[in-house]
Amino acid sequence: MITGIQITRSANSDLHNSFWLLDSETAQARCVCANAGYSEDQVVAVSDLGQIEYREIPLDVKPQVRVEGGQHLNVNVLSRETLEEAVENPDKYPQLTIRVSGYAVRFNSLTPEQQRDVITRTFTDSL
């Protein structure tokens, strides 16, 4: 848990009236601002602050959405034969829509190279 503090008393005069974020899980303190001796965002062990007195400062913490990695899946429900037929006879399939990179696109609007690529990537013999 993160707690905001203002140091009100310390043997180290550089710490007096400085503001810190204390992380109780890692036992570390991050300097928010100090008159001297510490730079903004400097991280030190809480024990390095020595004997201090402080007052807690209310924090307004907004939840963060973290996306770490992830995968994307496009699902096209049709057969290889249908796509190959659409390549040969585009007039018969004017409304054929597929998913490519998260977007819906008309198959006939793709270049021949893109159409071949879609067929190759959609229908594989093994993973």
Curated annotation (Swiss-Prot):
One of its GO terms (molecular function) is formate C-acetyltransferase activity. The keyword Iron does not apply. Keywords: Organic radical. Residues 5-127 form the Glycine radical domain. GO terms for cellular component: cytosol. The modification Glycine radical is found at G102. Pfam families: Gly_radical. NCBIfam families: spare_glycyl. Acts as a radical domain for damaged PFL and possibly other radical proteins. This is Autonomous glycyl radical cofactor. It comes from Erwinia tasmaniensis (strain DSM 17950 / CFBP 7177 / CIP 109463 / NCPPB 4357 / Et1/99).
